[in-house]
Amino acid sequence: MKTTTMSQLRQWKQEKRKFATLTAYDASFAQLFAEQGIQVLLVGDSLGMTLQGFDSTLPVTVADVAYHTRAVRRGAPHCLLLADMPFMSYATPELAFTHAAELMRAGANMVKLEGGSWLCDTIRMLAERAVPVCGHLGLTPQSVNIFGGYKVQGREEVAANQLLQDAIALEQAGAQLLVLECVPVELAQRVTEELTIPVIGIGAGNVTDGQILVMHDALGITGGHTPKFSKNFLAHSAGDIRAAIKLYIEEVEGGIYPAEEHTFQ
């Protein structure tokens, strides 16, 4: 099996070929996802909520993410593997480089940072030192206390224009990939068309180059509130996890998921 690379993702964008991604936190699920055809995985700081039982991602540490990154890498050696930089782990460019290096040594191919134009110096520093970066705009969970909860971002014209400018700035600083979370579909389309780098959506409609879901949401095992953008693929697959993942991939690649009911206007 060939290793998935950023060059492939850029080619997929040019070919308008959509791709599906998932979060993963251990070797067993990572292997299962890879065997069904998932080629990009994220060790998300969402592990703080899905695995550790916290009510936000803020308590997650770099050591936590590194531990799970090593496990996922062992289970899916050929996937393009992203690792989240936890809250305050990139407060300065120097701190970001130290922690990014730790995650790269753990097996990540790329690190993901949440934030807008203020991150450009950090992204530039990392890119110059051979650390690939994925940006993250829209609803950035590490900023939950500023947002006052998990709310759709970019609905007002001023906010939408700022997000678009932030996306352009992140790409110019050296980001190779962008995650866009919980934004109106019209804004997601503007960002996806404006950028030359691939854009992965979550709660951003079916107009982005790729889609990502937290694995627990895709399998319908999330306790409590279920996000509007999520779909329980396991329930549509007679309880067969492998079939559920294949269905997720098929619906993303076919532009079926996310449907209108999963989309914000």
Swiss-Prot record:
Query: Which reaction does this enzyme catalyse, per its entry?
Result: 3-methyl-2-oxobutanoate + (6R)-5,10-methylene-5,6,7,8-tetrahydrofolate + H2O = 2-dehydropantoate + (6S)-5,6,7,8-tetrahydrofolate
Its principal location?
Answer: cytoplasm
Query: How cofactor binds (record note)?
Result: Binds 1 Mg(2+) ion per subunit.
In what pathway does it function? Cofactor biosynthesis; (R)-pantothenate biosynthesis; (R)-pantoate from 3-methyl-2-oxobutanoate: step 1/2
Name the cofactor(s): Mg(2+)
User: Which is one Gene Ontology cellular component term of this protein?
Assistant: cytoplasm
List the active-site residues. E181 (proton acceptor)
Q: List UniProt keywords, sorted A-Z.
A: Cytoplasm, Magnesium, Metal-binding, Pantothenate biosynthesis, Transferase
- Provide the residue positions that the database annotates as binding 3-methyl-2-oxobutanoate: D45, S46, D84, K112
Q: Does the keyword Ribonucleoprotein apply?
A: no
Q: Which residues bind Mg(2+)?
A: D45, D84, E114
Which principal EC class is assigned to this enzyme? transferase
Tell where it localizes: Cytoplasm
Q: Which Gene3D superfamilies match?
A: Phosphoenolpyruvate-binding domains (3.20.20.60)
Instruction: Indicate yes or no for the key word Metal-binding.
Output: yes
GO molecular-function annotation terms? 3-methyl-2-oxobutanoate hydroxymethyltransferase activity; magnesium ion binding
EC number(s) given by UniProt: 2.1.2.11
GO terms for biological process?
pantothenate biosynthetic process
Protein purpose: Catalyzes the reversible reaction in which hydroxymethyl group from 5,10-methylenetetrahydrofolate is transferred onto alpha-ketoisovalerate to form ketopantoate.
Quaternary state and partners of this protein?
Homodecamer; pentamer of dimers.
Which family is annotated?
Belongs to the PanB family.
Protein name according to UniProt: 3-methyl-2-oxobutanoate hydroxymethyltransferase
Q: What is the lineage of its organism?
A: Bacteria, Pseudomonadati, Pseudomonadota, Gammaproteobacteria, Enterobacterales
- Underlying gene: panB
